[in-house]
Swiss-Prot record:
The active site is at 14, 140. Catalyzes the phosphorylation of the position 2 hydroxy group of 4-diphosphocytidyl-2C-methyl-D-erythritol. Keywords: ATP-binding, Isoprene biosynthesis, Kinase, Nucleotide-binding, Transferase. NCBIfam families: ispE (TIGR00154). Pathway: Isoprenoid biosynthesis; isopentenyl diphosphate biosynthesis via DXP pathway; isopentenyl diphosphate from 1-deoxy-D-xylulose 5-phosphate: step 3/6. Pfam families: GHMP_kinases_C (PF08544), GHMP_kinases_N (PF00288). GO terms for molecular function: 4-(cytidine 5'-diphospho)-2-C-methyl-D-erythritol kinase activity; ATP binding. GO terms for biological process: isopentenyl diphosphate biosynthetic process, methylerythritol 4-phosphate pathway; terpenoid biosynthetic process. The keyword Transferase applies. It catalyses: 4-CDP-2-C-methyl-D-erythritol + ATP = 4-CDP-2-C-methyl-D-erythritol 2-phosphate + ADP + H(+). Its EC number is 2.7.1.148. ATP binds at residues 98-108. This is 4-diphosphocytidyl-2-C-methyl-D-erythritol kinase. It comes from Francisella philomiragia subsp. philomiragia (strain ATCC 25017 / CCUG 19701 / FSC 153 / O#319-036).
Amino acid sequence: MANIKLKNYQSYAKINLFLHILNKRDDGYHNLQTWFTFLDLKDHISFRFNNSNKIEITSNIQIASKEDNLIYKAVKEFQEAYNIESIGVDIDIIKNIPMGAGLGGGSSNAATTLIALRDYYLPELSNEQMIPLATKLGADVPIFVYGRSAWAEGIGDVLYSKDFEQQYVVLVKPNIHISTKEFFESENLVKTKNMLPRDLSFDTSVMHNDFENVFFAKYPEFKSQLDEIDQDFRMTGTGSCFYLLSKDLNKLQQLARKVDKSLDKWVVKTLNYAY
């Protein structure tokens, strides 16, 4: 066990460059294909290990109760999976990644927690060895444990390293949301029938987000807002964040100034590693 009692980590956001829903599995999950890359938008998490045998979580925002908190669940799953007799840790998180945005904030925090616990208790474990445990916490948690841009299949847990050429990103987030359950039950969801080859370059003509039609069918006025700025916005995950990619930072900064003041916005850049 390491002697360092306090460790600080950065917990990064992700976007889905595309998201194709293929079919429903016997376990209730859906097989998918997606390409993940990261953003330099991040939360900051500190872990102070102690002998209290208590897990305390604080934040700069209101957070879920322990039973509903992915960070807490990550600690308990790690403790059970690796037979750690007792864990005492004070966890403080400074949230910058918006919640309910499709940016993976909660999943990223859970993955960062697994990595911090690994570093302290079992430093011999590799990130890849923790992916089955990460999958138990949610379909987006494995990519953050994996820690680099990747093509994903299965439920998001079968990962193949695949870099994405760095670009700038403008993110736009409306104060609206659709539940995952509603997405899958919508008559507007058209699933992708054919799998794409993993060596495919980024191609917006064949890569899309199957959930976009559902979102725009429910909120057509938001689509109109986006189209007035630029018609190439794409949704990440199940939203509600939309993003626009460009190698031209000045262009994106100018477009960001056109975004309605009622919408949250960020200008960031993509990253191939979440370290």
